[in-house]
């Protein structure tokens, strides 16, 4: 097994290059939080004698996580959010490097000598009812005996006491094409808590926001009428609703719908970016991101 650690300064500079923006020639100051990365690549031998389809099963992890922040209590809370989003609730209370090592160890144990382990069956059952903000949301969902699994995260926005990142998961269980998912997280760096959809929108926002989302998808796909989306691979447009899988920046809010959520899998994930001016009337003035909106 190869495990490597990337120190924070290099990564901080990389994140700054990727996410820093300029306004009238002035660079926007980022939050004073440092990151490191742990990289894991491990091949598990197939010990089930009935399985002759592959020489081994591969797990790859590229985990970027915060290591330094002025408020120690907030830092610990944010670190737990990162572990929870990347590895699942089971590992959230462990120190990050210990959590990664434990995940890698458990992964092998659950694959060993089983067609479908109890653990995998439990997480597979939860996949059908994934709740991006629910208390029982566990991102360690995986199929039975995947041929490979990739896990990575990326920082999307890191300014004005708000930190947004996305977790990417890809796996293949012997099907013609892999499964790919993106899960977005918005963190309030004043508290270390995750920011939820219900915290930033007024009551009864969903119908109005759904229409705005569908209109944005139609505009991006250059169709004359929103109903025409169904002719190019989208499912019933009346069933497209905000799914709580979003991130924010200083321009607007972006929703991600994963493959097959609202459209045929061949279309891939759908990303919907909406400027605040389009949704400001639906948003709360007392939310953790209100200073970005108003």
Model-predicted segments: where are they?
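C-terminal motif of bacterial Sec signal peptides marking the signal peptidase cleavage site
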Residues: 17-20
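Bacterial N-terminal signal peptides that target proteins for export
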Residues: 1-9
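Hydrophobic helical h-region of N-terminal Sec-dependent signal peptides
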Residues: 9-15
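Compositionally biased intrinsically disordered regions enriched in Thr/Gly
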Residues: 22-294
